[in-house]
A protein has these predicted regions:
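N-terminal amphipathic/basic-hydrophobic helices that include classical n-h-c signal peptides
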Residues: 1-25
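Nucleotidyltransferase catalytic core that binds NTPs
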Residues: 19-185
């Protein structure tokens, strides 16, 4: 799916097709930040749904100081690129610093996050409030995770893969392959 930079989309207004161009209004840009260690189908689901709400999505690999990573930033970036190759307009970047600073640098109005079970709520609430305190102009938008992905996470998938568990359908094929290589299977 591509979005031309001049013609953004065609929509129906009062039954007539209207062409909306970039210059007609400000692009609604969202950053979808995360560790993506590695990207899972749960993340892809949020990205695909977010892309229906925003004109521009930037998937940003950021550093969470509380985590130890299995994949390097370069590996995570390559896996994201491969997994999102049918969406060439979705940007993928890495950033080392404050998320809200990055959002400002990218002219993004929103931070997109997926919300899984109730257990996510406290952490996400804390992070959203802190980000708002740091910059009131950047809004956090939550999408409810698809039911299929409600109990998945990168860690649980890595653990299953490490012990030879079948993770088909939970991660994009490139990630499945890379996990097999990492764990020597
Ligand atoms: N489906 C399935 N799993 C999902 C998911 C979905 N839709 N959305 C998130 N997850 C999982 C991830 O796989 C991840 O699992 P893991 O903990 O087992 O790795 C977990 O939910 C949350 O990870 P993620 O969304 O990648 O966030 P994070 O906590 O790793 O990273 C940052 C949070 C990077 C966005 C945050 O630390 C940050 O903003 N860092 C920059 C510094 C900064 O600005 N800090 C101040 C913020 S207050």
């Amino acid at each position: 799916m591509t979005r031309s930079s001049s013609v953004l989309k065609r929509e129906l207004f009062a039954g007539n097709e209207v062409t909306i161009r970039n210059a007609d209004f400000m692009l609604r840009t969202a950053i979808y930040p995360g560790s993506f260690d590695p990207v899972t189908n749960g993340h892809i689901d949020i990205i695909e749904r977010g892309f229906k709400l925003f004109d521009r999505i930037i998937v940003a690999i950021l550093h969470n100081p509380a985590k130890k990573y299995l994949f390097s930033v370069d590996e995570r970036m390559t896996l994201l690129r491969e997994s999102l190759k049918k969406y060439p307009d979705i940007e993928i970047e890495a950033f080392d610093g404050l998320l809200v600073d990055y959002a400002v640098q990218k002219n993004a109005q929103a931070i997109l996050r997926g919300m899984r079970a109730v257990s996510d709520f406290e952490y996400e609430f804390q992070m959203a409030l802190m980000n708002r305190r740091l910059n009131r102009n950047v809004q956090t938008v939550f999408l409810m995770t698809g039911l299929r992905w409600i109990f998945t996470s990168s860690s649980i998938i890595k653990e299953a893969a490490c012990f030879g568990g079948n993770i088909n359908g939970m991660v994009p094929p490139a990630v499945n392959q890379k996990l097999k290589e990492k764990f020597g299977r």
